[in-house]
Amino acid sequence: MATTATCTRFTDDYQLFEELGKGAFSVVRRCVKKTSTQEYAAKIINTKKLSARDHQKLEREARICRLLKHPNIVRLHDSISEEGFHYLVFDLVTGGELFEDIVAREYYSEADASHCIHQILESVNHIHQHDIVHRDLKPENLLLASKCKGAAVKLADFGLAIEVQGEQQAWFGFAGTPGYLSPEVLRKDPYGKPVDIWACGVILYILLVGYPPFWDEDQHKLYQQIKAGAYDFPSPEWDTVTPEAKNLINQMLTINPAKRITADQALKHPWVCQRSTVASMMHRQETVECLRKFNARRKLKGAILTTMLVSRNFSVGRQSSAPASPAASAAGLAGQAAKSLLNKKSDGGVKKRKSSSSVHLMEPQTTVVHNATDGIKGSTESCNTTTEDEDLKVRKQEIIKITEQLIEAINNGDFEAYTKICDPGLTSFEPEALGNLVEGMDFHKFYFENLLSKNSKPIHTTILNPHVHVIGEDAACIAYIRLTQYIDGQGRPRTSQSEETRVWHRRDGKWLNVHYHCSGAPAAPLQ
């Protein structure tokens, strides 16, 4: 029987060195080509962990990167598949992020911002000429070729990039990073190349004053701002910016994508192509200071999101004696730090749009511990990125949240709240019913009236690894392990475990639990 020879071209041709970065399924390491001693950055993807769809995305990224050869784009030099791993060999860019470099400069002017956006537009124009849309233009993906003064800006990370048909618009899914998403993507309209120009407009705005045009702690409010194109040029920081710079921003942040300036047109704008005579040369110290805070906030937000993937905590009415886990404490402390940083008046223009929502350090009454399977990947590589499955992820989070609310109602002995979340004809299989199918609320009402409502002892519930299956627009199923900690009648701590499945149906915009299946120990702790 013939055997297929395993490819070892990467292992044979390249020597690996230190790690440069890490993601959910990939790691980036410095490597050297043995024959030339040339240094590169190798993105190593563990293909054993990839789904069929992930494989398609990987192939698409490699195909797109092979097409693009431009001095302002991180170039792909090689793409090699070996047993269990795929290697993408890129330029080794050593200058770090553009935004981090700016804050280290002694002098930074509007003309410098013009030079930066010029290079970014050159890269965007190149990819658009090849019918590629990046979809994730943001500061994290704008790198410098080296640490030398005047090093080229390079556009990186084509993981969300797509191939389009010329100027044709279509719905390619919800992808990007919240503050840089265009109105048409948020409206779920067909879209194309103009989404990259919108993101360039956001980046240019930040380059000039150090804070973003759209901001709110509440993502829904942020999206409303973007869809309305609700940005302005507040005094005093914008008073020293030339009208030509504001004009270019206005043309980039045009709500109607058909009327938005193109990359080619933007490169011909006087503020870009005649910067020496049009752009101001005045040093912008306040911009540098605001940008420093903006950078700190970006990094902190990434750390918080990564921490919160480990453990999310939700508050219920009763006080619990159960201590917060280390991950929960870290998430809470990070949340407090974020709140402090975000609400400071001096924080890079956020003063203009303070959110009424806030981050609280919560008592751990109902804890949800996710694994990395439900569209929530523990990736520091994309923790600030909305994935292509964002729509699905949001709906899954909605189901997890309503399940938490239902369990909180049970823990609180609140039958009224319970009935508002459950269908009157709720069917259930559960240990308390001795394997019989129960229909309606009366069976559960007995426990609420005679056990749960009389229970004054602390209860702490942990939902482990919730798996959500979305079934069409208005139905979903969630399966999880539920651990319930409680104090028994003798004052001793106890834990019960049950494996639960709930089927949810949305009617008139409201989710109702229509079926419940529980195995293991009774969910209601016996006193």
From Swiss-Prot:
Induction note: By cocaine in cardiomyocytes.
Disulfide topology: none
Record keyword Nucleotide-binding present: yes
Keyword tags: ATP-binding, Calmodulin-binding, Developmental protein, Differentiation, Kinase, Membrane, Neurogenesis, Nucleotide-binding, Phosphoprotein, Sarcoplasmic reticulum, Serine/threonine-protein kinase, Transferase
Region entry Disordered, spans: 344-389
Pfam families, sorted: CaMKII_AD, Pkinase
Record region (Autoinhibitory domain): 283-292
E.C. number: 2.7.11.17
Chief location bin: membrane
Catalytic activity: L-seryl-[protein] + ATP = O-phospho-L-seryl-[protein] + ADP + H(+); L-threonyl-[protein] + ATP = O-phospho-L-threonyl-[protein] + ADP + H(+)
Activity regulation text: Activated by Ca(2+)/calmodulin. Binding of calmodulin results in conformational change that relieves intrasteric autoinhibition and allows autophosphorylation of Thr-287 which turns the kinase in a constitutively active form and confers to the kinase a Ca(2+)-independent activity.
Active site (record annotation): D136 (proton acceptor)
EC class of the enzyme, as a word: transferase
One function term, GO molecular function aspect: protein serine kinase activity
Processing and modification events after translation: Autophosphorylation of Thr-287 following activation by Ca(2+)/calmodulin. Phosphorylation of Thr-287 locks the kinase into an activated state.
Gene Ontology BP term (one): regulation of neuron projection development
Modified-residue entries (Phosphothreonine), positions: T287, T306, T307
SUPFAM superfamilies listed in its UniProt record: NTF2-like, Protein kinase-like (PK-like)
Family per similarity comment: Belongs to the protein kinase superfamily. CAMK Ser/Thr protein kinase family. CaMK subfamily.
PANTHER family linked: SERINE/THREONINE-PROTEIN KINASE
Protein's UniProt name: Calcium/calmodulin-dependent protein kinase type II subunit gamma
